[in-house]
Structure formats: C-alpha cells, structure tokens
Amino acid sequence: MSELSQLIYDWNRDGRVAQADYRATELDDETLRDGLQGPSVRNPPLEVKKRLLHLMDDLGIDSADIGLPGASDQARAGIVALARETVGLRRLKPNCAVRTHATDVQAAIDASVEAGVPIETCAFIGSSPIRRFAEDWRLDGMLANVETAVSMAVKAGLPVMFVTEDTTRADPQTLRRLYTLAIECGARRICASDTVGHATPEGVRNLLAFLRDEVIAPTKATVKLDYHGHNDRGLGVINALAATAMADRVHGCALGIGERVGNTAMDQLLVNLYLFGLVDRDLTPLVEYVELVSRYCGVPVPANYPALGADAFRTGTGVHAAAVIKALRKDDRDLADRVYSGVPASVLGREQRIEVGPMSGESNVVWWLSSHGYTATRDTIERIFAAAKASDRILTDEELAALAGGKS
C-alpha cells in the first residue's frame, strides 16, 4: 500500500499566499422546496420524497426544507406527511418556507400541529433596492410584515429562521434593520441568500462578516447564521465553501437543481467537505440520492458531472489509462484511485474504468481483454486497436466483445 500523503503535494494546504479556512458546518437540504422550483423539474411522488429524506439523514445532513405550506392545501398535506417521516430519523429535522404573511405563517403552524412535529419556520422577504423598487415596497411596510410573521411563529412555539432574499445585493442599512427586528421578535437563526447567484467568494465573506459582527453581535442574542446560494455564475459550490468560514449552516440541493440554473449542488459540496477532512461519513448514499432526483425530477445527469457523472472515473486516453493500469497491477486500489483522479472513486463506492477508443494505447486494449476474460493475443490486440483508431468515439463493451471473438 502506497503512502499517498507522501506522493501528493497539496497546494490547497500550502498556505504561502492563501489559506483555506473552511469549517465543518450544519447542512440544510433544499431539494424538496427550492429544488422543485426549477422550471424544468418535475415534482416527485411522495414516497420518493420520503426516501430522499432517509438518504439525506444517511448522509449526515442536518435539516431539510420540505415545502411551502402556504402554497396550497395539497402542499400543506405533503409537508405534514414529510414532517412525520422525519420522526424516526437519527439527525434530519424539517423546516418549511413561508412568506412574511400571516396566512403563510398560520399554514406552517397548522402543519406543525397536525404533524406533531416542530417544523422550523423560514420566513422570507426580499431586501435589495432593485426588488423593492420593482415591487413598490416601503421599508416601514416590510418591517411591519417581518414583525407580524416572526412574532406569530415564535408565539406558536416554532423555531424561526428569518431570511432575506437577494441579500447579496442589499444595502447594509436595510439589512441591519430587517434582521435586528427579526431577532428582537425571537428569530434565533438568520439566513443570507444569494438569490440570483450574484456573489463571489469575496462577497460571501464580506456579507457574512457584516451579519456576524455588525448585526448579530450587537443584539447579544444567541443567533445562528445560514447561507443560501445559487449558481447563476457557476460559483455555487465555491461560494458555499467560503460561507463555511463564518456560517453555522449552509444550504444546497441534489444535483444543484432549483430556480433558473439552480442552487449549490449538495452532492458536490459534501464531496469537497469530505476531501478537506471536514466531514467523516459514508458518501456512497450519494449515488442513490442523485439517481432518484435525476429519475423522478426529470433532470439528466451530464456524463461529465463531478464525482457522479458516468465519465467521472472513466478514461479511454492512453497516457491516463497506462498510469491507472500500472497502479492496478501493483494491486494498489488507493494509488489507482488517485493517480489520475482528484476525487477517489471509492469514496462514492465506484471504480476506475478503462475504456478503448481513438485516443487509447495498446495497454487499454490489453487491460480490457484481460479484465473481461479474454486472452490478449497479438492478433486480437491489433484488430481491436485498429478499430479503435478508426472510430470517432469510445467503443462499447458489445463492440469490443465482437472484435475479441470467443473467450478461451
């Protein structure tokens, strides 16, 4: 067995100019609420949602948003069923999203009472100048709505998180007034939202530092801080990692589904936290987690999707394959998993796969033949190698088997 720590120099931890300050945080899964708001996403059956809650729990996720109770009677009934499903789980707790409207809050209260489960109520309101201008909102009216909604939920005995939408484009003065009022009314968790995917990692850090030091600290209250990100600029995962430096809980969705181009990908976030040594848990349930969401939400997984796509641990390139094959011939799976992969396949319960195509070397052909029970004769190798070089793609196992002929 190789000592991989001595074979890989990790510039991510070098520290001479920049030092990652990521931390282990709580995780909130938004797949069953914000994730389902994606315009191309289908609403999965209730039994699938229940299974997803169990997988989230298996993955060590701390909480899950199970819907908008104020949306309809059907939505509220689904929330009741899902909240009841969490009762037997080891870790996962339910929450739901409500507008800062009394009717929405009452729907959350009713759902919690019917389920017999305290459902964390996440009361949200837009906060940025552009949103306020578009809506013709006055700050005094917004503050009145916040006071009514938060006080109502707190009085009913529900844990409350107060959320501002578009926080990453809102001015400090407005944010200070909205959050401070919510805390004074009893909210014990606040959430910053990058609703339109505007933020960079620097912006996330600046915003969370402001909320921690200039909003929460002066209240002297014990208040936790959440971060909710979107992926419009392709920065969802790195922003979420940056948020862990200061946030108590970070949000994400399976496969990054959600509004427009989606949310932070929870699966990718978990893989990165694992690789940084910030979570120590079995990540093999991620395979079923993303497969269920893909199948029942109608979201195809791209072949090149990080860690979980079909091509994540697959190569037909001669140079790459040769290195992996040599590691496998040393009977060193860990070495094979890392020599040409930044994410070990074994973390996901997967394996490196050697294919044969136009970019392959002969070693690809020999490996494929031996691993599929064929004798690697010179004629067979040359026949397959010639066919691969003439092809414009990776050859399928069926095509290779036909070229290989009978096993001996």
Sequence positions of predicted segments:
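A mid-to-C-terminal "edge-of-domain" accessory segment
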Residues: 2-33, 279-408
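Conserved active-site and cofactor/substrate-binding residues in soluble primary-metabolism enzymes
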Residues: 44-47, 51, 73-77, 103, ...
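Catalytic alpha/beta core domains of metabolic enzymes, predominantly
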Residues: 199-331
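N-terminal capping/small domains of soluble enzymes
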Residues: 1-100, 353-356, 360, 371-372, ...
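Alpha/beta enzyme core
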Residues: 22, 27, 38, 43-62, ...
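Hydrophobic alpha-helical scaffolding
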Residues: 42, 68-72, 94, 98, ...
